């Protein structure tokens, strides 16, 4: 009998986890890919550095989040408005939310009304907000040096800085 309750509890937990999908634009914004970023994740007092690469893959975008040694932490494909696991890494809802929030931050001002139609967002010089539900919102702050500060949760923020790849050359 307790096995049934455990199965019901796990099913309910799965439904709750799947119910909140990150807000995504329809269709994807016009961005020049690939993009590479240095990411600093601030979770309370802890700060973690990582690298994020966004690249075109067929008709979708591959998001690869790597630790400083280049080990993948999350890999997701965004295609047809849906996230899909890419490779052997399991789906990571926190990574998906970060990727979706960064996509909102990177969307050009001129495309916001079209791509986020029907969503509760506002934009002002140096700042942008997207309300997710009655109790949460993504806050975006733009620094003059090109850095982006994303606040995606009560104690979870990201500092995102574009990496300059103009001097890189192919082997």
PLM regions: where:
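Short, low-complexity, disordered segments immediately C-terminal to signal peptides
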Residues: 23-33
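Hydrophobic beta-strand positions
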Residues: 65, 76-77, 129-131
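N-terminal, post-signal-peptide region of Sec/Tat-exported proteins
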Residues: 52-74
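Bacterial N-terminal signal peptides that target proteins for export
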Residues: 1-8
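C-terminal motif of bacterial Sec signal peptides marking the signal peptidase cleavage site
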Residues: 14-17
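Short acidic-glycine loop/turn motifs at beta-strand connectors
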Residues: 57, 78-82
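Mature, soluble, non-transmembrane domains
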Residues: 19-21, 37-40, 45, 50-53, ...
